[in-house]
């Protein structure tokens, strides 16, 4: 059973298209796993309603930022905003703010 659907915004798709084949496959596999089971190692909350998908592959730490859209009662969406290859222990505040701005713009455009 899937807990949510994932919708990729253009920047998230661009990021995924730049990732080499097997790493991209692992990212997509982990995202599919996160949809079907609640695992904070795969999908973790940050702040201000921003979450991120986590994948480690051959020493690289891939992150795809996302937020929840529960406006439709029939379908819970997770909107993937953009991604980074993590180089430090914590996600940069600027990346969280970027995801928050994308989230705000997304909901403003739905009004």
Report each predicted region and the residues it spans.
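Basic, Lys/Arg-enriched alpha-helical interface segments
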Residues: 1-61, 70-78, 85-111
């Amino acid at each position: 059973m899937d807990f949510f659907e994932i919708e990729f915004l253009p920047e998230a798709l661009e990021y995924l298209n730049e990732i080499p084949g097997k790493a991209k496959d692992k990212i997509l596999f982990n995202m599919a796993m996160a949809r079907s089971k609640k695992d904070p190692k795969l999908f973790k909350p940050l702040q201000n309603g921003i979450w991120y998908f986590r994948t480690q592959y051959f020493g690289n730490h891939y992150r795809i930022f996302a937020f929840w859209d529960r406006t439709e009662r029939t379908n819970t969406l997770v909107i993937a905003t953009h991604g980074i290859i993590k180089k430090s222990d914590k996600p940069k505040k600027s990346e969280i703010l970027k995801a928050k701005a994308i989230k705000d713009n997304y909901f403003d455009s739905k009004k």
